[in-house]
């Protein structure tokens, strides 16, 4: 506005009260000052650069909206938005101040406001104006003041200025005074007529008039602050009726105008209270802006009734006082017929519940007719008289009913029909399930129990098999972690295998994951000869299936077509002597019992794979099974590998060659335990006529991992399922799962940061540094729990420095990291900045110092 400081504040407050009082609205001075201070905080440019025009005022509104989004709506004064909206309507209707700015573009805003304020404040205090006396003197004085600021030339040049320009300024100010005097009312009617009787359109003033103006200007002094005169407060006086421009009798606005003239208040909203309490408040009707209705209808049509933006518009509408009839009219005008019926039903239910809850309270009674707008409150005119508390309840029920409208295209079905898709991730299914449950009932213990039950019952068959071991003891978070292995790649591979076998997806999953004992699925037992279901091998009538396929080239001697178990050669095709054939493991069908040897028990060869390390390459018949009921044959790595995230997909050799059994196809899938440890196996298909080496595609899923030579990393499924007399590693599987695959280790790369590791001590989690130079584990004093007993030791710890006053745990502590655990007696050092994990723990965790060359690796 061109004026800052206390003078600018008083000017703004005066103008604000004056403009609003002309519309019949009263604003306290304290509220106006609070709004001005908030305006400076939101738009600091406004006092110096802004003006009361529609463009700048809309910019202020946008900045108020951003301020509310950043600091919350509670940080905005309660009168800020109503004042801004009223001024926007005034500026839209081309208020007097806007017209003044448009007419006097050559005069700066600061000069015109100061001149206008001084003129109005002085003229309002005068009792009589005279036809050519006081008014002309005041105008001439203001012209002289403005001329002193407008012209920067010396006094002599001012005398030579064009008189026509001065006359233009006089004519502009006269027009402003004329409009201001017209708004003073009956109190100055007589003086206004005399003042307006002057011929303002006369371009040339007579010499007598100019003499009168100069004489009055000599006695004119305005030493007071620039405060526009405002109407005095009238205690308990009903505000004047709102002065509105006549609406054109066309369209929706014309229909509303005609209805108001005839006394029809069907669409009378919102209700505006003019005071601060229910006793003094006199409800006044104001129409809801048509732009708001159009915005709400557009949001419902384009984004749906339950979209976040639509709900924001509904909240904006709910910020006003709307009666039940208003809400019904708004919902009927913006919602589709079906959604309106849903909204009305929910609104009635919410209202009945609220009346029942309020029945036992001693406060003002709230009847169902008040909330629904029925009975004696059926007419809109009677609903206007409802108290604020009742209107708040009406708005609350209306908004809750609106939020209960489902999104477009979503049918309200029972929760039992909300099932997980075959290719849908489990966490996405849980998200949909929680959204549906929370729409029906509030969050609480009951909803959590229902979600957990449906999370098991409505999951797909693969996730149900993964959740089954922890169904009763686990939580929803445990279910999600268990189903992380059910990645889309695994599901896609399983679906492809089921399609090749000609089975349903659910049936194939049950057979693959042990849905029936001995390979018996939902369709009955599976024949190990022909691969079909419904009968066993001894009852198989397929003659082709009863005959054993002819053997290929012997993998032992490479010079005959016979089975390896029947090979009697002592030399291979190159004349090299062959080791004696292990008849107890090859010729007999007895299983190899016991666990696979640990890395410490075996040096070279294939560790823990069940394969003979002295006779590579291997065939399909040499691959072992984990247990007799295992569906897949184990594929093992034949070299040491270190995988990082940067390596991408790598090929792991298995040294398995040869064709698959006739009529079968191989599917390579990963093991669930490996994925938990950070190793991801990509599925692959092996054709029946493939004769090369089978390799496994792997990559690091989370961080760097180590694969030792001989570790089982994948499984080979023969489709259709064929039970071959392969060796078995373990007689019974028992309850083992997700951790039976060994030797895929935790790895941390050495970087600029310290190698830190989380370890549990007596169930408490500690973060410490891997210190290969520490013989014993040392716990920092700040990490040690106060209730754990310790005792002082007479010895001191010495390394690069020396630590005195060392304590030690009075009781042994059990440590645990992943599937490894042990007992330690750690030291407690008060001055230690962080915990140090010593070699007493690292050797049991199997921490290894490795490089890209496995020969340079060293175990701790």
From Swiss-Prot:
Optimum pH is 4-6 for protease. One of its GO terms (cellular component) is viral nucleocapsid. The active site is at 771 (protease). The record marks 99-100, 195-196, 228-229, 254-255, 269-270, 496-497, 745-746 as: Cleavage. A zinc finger (CCHC-type) spans 525-542, 552-569. GO terms for molecular function: aspartic-type endopeptidase activity; DNA binding; dUTP diphosphatase activity; structural constituent of virion; zinc ion binding. Pfam families: dUTPase, Gag_p10, Gag_p24, Gag_p24_C, RVP, zf-CCHC, zf-CCHC_5. Residues 766-841 form the Peptidase A2 domain. SMART domains: ZnF_C2HC. It catalyses: dUTP + H2O = dUMP + diphosphate + H(+). PROSITE patterns: ASP_PROT_RETROV, ASP_PROTEASE, ZF_CCHC. A lipid is attached at residue 2 (N-myristoyl glycine). A motif (PTAP/PSAP motif) lies at residues 305-308. Keywords: Aspartyl protease, Capsid protein, DNA-binding, Hydrolase, Lipoprotein, Magnesium, Metal-binding, Myristate, Protease, Viral matrix protein, Viral nucleoprotein, Virion, Zinc, Zinc-finger. It comes from the Viruses. Its EC number is 3.6.1.23, 3.4.23.-. GO terms for biological process: proteolysis; viral translational frameshifting. Signal peptide: none annotated. PANTHER family: ENDOGENOUS RETROVIRUS GROUP K MEMBER 24 GAG POLYPROTEIN-RELATED, IGE-BINDING PROTEIN. Nucleocapsid protein p14: Binds strongly to viral nucleic acids and promote their aggregation. Also destabilizes the nucleic acids duplexes via highly structured zinc-binding motifs. This is Gag-Pro polyprotein. It comes from Mouse mammary tumor virus (strain BR6) (MMTV). The gene is gag-pro.
